[in-house]
């Protein structure tokens, strides 16, 4: 299910993620704890792209999963990613990256459905 990415696509993806990183780093409109989480995941993504020749797509997928999965554990992070233009753009970019490295589509849609299911289970148990 993993695809091989050519060098030009890797460079394009990496530059795009680095630009997002810089934009978030200088932003004054993001809470420090949320900014810290986002920057941490973006650095991991940049590193996994840099090491693609060694690790392949698997490391990139792992970072994407962790980035989206963190939304379940941190409410402020989830709110930022779900309800701000910057967060939505970041999720969209991560979806683009996921499509380039896998044959799967709709990873973010599946993640959102998973979050809804988890919330429904939590509500049901309360």
Where are these regions (language model features)?
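Membrane-active, amphipathic/fusogenic segments and juxtamembrane/transmembrane anchors
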Residues: 2-81
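Membrane-inserting effector segments that mediate pore formation, membrane fusion
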Residues: 74-126
